[in-house]
A protein has these predicted regions:
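Membrane-integrated ABC transporters
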Residues: 1-44, 59-74, 92-96, 100, ...
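Hydrophobic alpha-helical transmembrane segments of ABC transporter permease domains
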Residues: 24, 35, 88, 136-181, ...
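Transmembrane helix-loop-helix hairpins at lipid-water interfaces of multipass membrane proteins
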Residues: 30-88, 168-173, 284-288
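Alpha-helical transmembrane segments of multi-pass membrane proteins
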Residues: 42, 81-100, 151-158, 179-205, ...
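Helix-loop-helix
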Residues: 60-62, 67, 166-180, 250-323, ...
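Juxtamembrane loop-to-helix connectors within ABC transporter transmembrane domains
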Residues: 96, 100, 114-161, 219
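An intracellular "coupling" helix at the cytosolic face of ABC transporter transmembrane type-1 domains
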Residues: 120-121, 137-146, 150, 154, ...
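ABC-type nucleotide-binding domain
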Residues: 344-592
Length: 592
């Protein structure tokens, strides 16, 4: 996994440029929103001058009578300014919220599309939780950062510059004093921001790791309980949780310093204005209205620095999230298949492996499949057996084109699968994996997943073939019962449902990866009979450690260390007394 804590300033700048490029269709409307934010800030700046004018009108009228009409005119003008400023702020917030919501919608859509385009090696090197964190947490963080922080920074900057100008116009000596104090605070903020970026990156990455671990442990919580591994899980979770806590603490500590710091700076500026302003007023250099205006200007002058600091803090978090998002979006994709065939004549099911050599992309020096060759005739049931790590599942993954081979060729009916699109290859197979996959939906929806025109008669037929008919009929709504936590369903029943789904797909070839590893003996017999019917006339590849389930296979390929060391049917291999016979006998010795 990439280490984001080593991200450079250039990478963060690059991430923000990519965000701008990503939003290029909305640049115009975003510019309007930012202009409105600046206008709202500028209108606010006029307020203190008018308040000072009202103060002078009141002070001058204490002896001769207050000009209430003049006070009313200034007051109405002041109210109109504040209302207009609030209106501009509301409009820009609405615009930014709309734009960023559309951006996050598009970004999540692109991330969803990307998931189907990245090679398998990406999923092997990144946890599911980390990928999910990019799609959910990081996109939300980026959206919130752009919605709130960017306009805040622009309006605060406009307010800062406008206040500075008005302060010099009103009284340059007080402006210099305020500027000196504020400049010192600004220097401290810039220094803190430069030191805090890595902690925001740490926070996002540590959160992704925590999400990944929680997802893994939740999906395997039964194994954790059975293995009495709760204490180890708790300990490891505690370490990850502490890392998230520490990263958040450091980032929040540094960002939390900024607002109190600006409050201190602002209060010092207030004191300086009051002391030196009073001296100038007593000397007759300025009026008390100027002091009132200046006190308000100091508040408006220092508060933008805190807003800018907080906005920059949020933008740092947003840019860290953007970096993680674009790291995924710009990751390597599957090779282009526009020139490959998406159609194939009627599939018979002849499969040929010729001198296949393969190593995983992340470990090119570690060869998994060394020199695999085999001929499988149409309609044969082929069992691939061998010890763990022999290359059984890898061979099936290569057949399905989940990975590309280093050398050699794999052909179906004489056509190399490298010349066919992946979708074409996948459509040739039905597949039952070790890990059952069911989603929260009805039994019907789970069985007919991505298939159309499946009748109830077909559902009844496959369920009866798998021995599921009685189970389905006992459910409250039958096929329309929603599978959720409230519906008690065993591991064996889940396995049967996935096998029934494979039956419905009715593909010309079949892959069974440990299909009966999680069912009892009686259910295994039911499945075995159903599979015998299903595999009849279809080329079938069965991966199983329980060798008793593949005695009726037409061809058994015995693998060890990436090579096929024996081949033949059960009787031939047992008579040979080789490695297969050793594996077979060892299982029965263990059982006895």
């Amino acid at each position: 996994m990439r280490k984001y804590e080593k991200a450079s300033k250039g990478e963060m700048t690059s991430a923000m440029k990519k965000i701008i490029e990503y939003m290029k269709g909305s640049v115009g409307i975003v510019a309007v929103a930012l202009v409105l934010a600046a206008l709202g800030a500028v209108l606010t700046i006029i307020g203190p001058d008018k308040v000072g004018e009202i103060t002078d009108l009141m002070a001058d009228g204490l002896m001769t009578g207050i000009d209430l009409k003049a006070v009313a005119r200034v007051g109405i003008f002041l109210g109109a300014i504040y209302i207009s400023s609030s209106l501009f702020t509301f409009i820009q917030q609405y615009i930014m919220a709309t734009v960023t919501l559309k951006m996050s919608y598009r970004m999540r859509s692109d991330l969803s599309r990307k998931i189907n385009c990245v090679p398998q090696k990406y999923f092997n090197s990144h946890s599911q939780g980390d990928i999910l964190s990019r799609i959910t947490n990081d996109v939300s963080t980026l959206q919130q950062g752009l919605t709130n922080s960017l306009p805040t920074i622009i309006s605060a900057a406009a307010q800062f510059v406008g206040c500075l100008i008005m302060m010099f116009v009103t009284e340059w000596r007080l402006a210099l004093i305020s500027l000196f104090i504020t400049f010192f605070g600004l220097f401290l903020i810039v220094f803190i921001m430069s030191k805090s970026q890595k902690f925001f990156l740490d926070r996002q990455e540590s959160l992704g790791k925590l999400n990944g671990y929680v997802e893994e442990m939740y999906s395997g919580h039964e194994v954790v309980r059975i293995s009495r591994g709760a204490e180890n899980v708790k300990k490891h979770f505690g370490g990850l949780n502490e890392a998230v806590y520490n990263a958040n603490l450091k980032s929040q500590f540094l960002s939390g310093i900024m607002q109190p710091l600006m409050n201190v700076i602002g209060n010092l500026a207030y004191v300086a204005v009051c002391v030196f302003g009073s001296m100038l007023a007593l000397n007759g250099t300025i009026t008390f209205g100027v002091i009132i205006s200046f006190i308000l200007y100091v508040r408006l002058f220092t508060s933008p620095l805190g807003q800018i600091a907080q906005g920059m803090t949020n933008m740092q978090t947003a840019s860290a999230s953007a970096q993680r998002i674009f790291d995924f979006i710009e990751s390597e994709e599957l090779s282009d298949e526009s020139g490959k065939s998406s159609e194939m004549p009627e599939v018979k099911g002849n499969v040929s492996f010729e001198n296949v050599r393969f190593s995983y992309p992340d470990t090119p020096d570690k060869v998994i499949i060394k020199n695999f060759s085999a001929e499988v005739k149409a309609g044969q049931k082929v069992a691939i057996v061998g010890p763990t790590g022999a290359g059984k599942t890898t061979m099936v993954n290569l057949l399905m084109r989940f990975f590309e081979i280093n050398s050699g060729s794999i052909s179906i009916d004489g056509t190399p699968i490298s010349q066919l699109s992946r979708e074409t290859v996948h459509n040739m197979f039905s597949m039952v994996l070790q890990d059952t996959w069911l989603f929260e939906g009805t039994v019907r929806e789970n069985l007919v997943y991505n298939m159309e025109g499946i009748s109830d008669e077909s559902l009844e037929r496959v369920c009866k073939a798998c021995g599921l008919d009685k189970f389905v009929h006992t459910l409250p709504e039958g096929f329309d019962t929603v599978l959720s936590e409230s519906v008690a369903i065993s591991a064996g029943q889940k396995q049967l449902l996935t096998i029934a789904r494979a039956m419905l797909q009715n593909a010309p070839m079949l892959i069974l990866d440990e299909a009966t590893s999680s069912v009892d003996t009686r259910t295994e017999l039911l499945i075995q009979r159903a599979m015998d019917k299903l595999t009849k006339g279809r080329t079938s590849f069965v991966i199983a450690h329980r060798l008793s389930t593949i005695k009726n296979a037409n061809l058994i390929l015995v693998m060890r260390d990436g090579d096929v060391i024996e081949s033949g049917n059960h009787e031939t291999l047992m008579a040979k007394g080789g490695f297969y016979a050793e594996l077979y006998n060892s299982q029965f010795d263990q059982a006895s």
